[in-house]
């Protein structure tokens, strides 16, 4: 089964080896036919602490690293 890859923006890099990535997606509401923007935050593993706030990154699913971390930063976009 292929791993999911998401694109988002780093909104926090205060913790050691972890960044918080905000991923936004747009979809059309089934009843109102209006495009709705929904965002979700993911904790991603950053081994080298090289990503800063505002960076656009790709994250990929991985094995559980901690209680809330199951994503790893793949690369900078």
UniProtKB/Swiss-Prot annotation:
GO CC entries: cytosolic small ribosomal subunit
InterPro entries recorded: NA-bd_OB-fold, Ribosomal_uS17, Ribosomal_uS17_bact/chlr, Ribosomal_uS17_CS
Keyword RNA-binding assigned: yes
MF GO annotations: rRNA binding; structural constituent of ribosome
Matching PANTHER family: 40S RIBOSOMAL PROTEIN S11 FAMILY MEMBER, SMALL RIBOSOMAL SUBUNIT PROTEIN US17M
UniProt similarity note: Belongs to the universal ribosomal protein uS17 family.
Protein name, entry field: Small ribosomal subunit protein uS17
Species of origin: Rickettsia prowazekii (strain Madrid E)
């Amino acid at each position: 089964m292929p791993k999911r890859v998401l694109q988002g923006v780093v909104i926090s890099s205060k913790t050691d080896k972890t960044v918080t990535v905000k991923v936004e997606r747009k979809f059309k509401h089934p009843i109102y036919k209006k495009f709705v923007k929904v965002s979700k935050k993911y904790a991603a593993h950053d081994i080298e602490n090289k990503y800063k706030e505002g960076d656009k990154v790709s994250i990929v699913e991985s094995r559980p690293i901690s209680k809330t971390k199951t994503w790893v930063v793949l690369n900078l976009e």
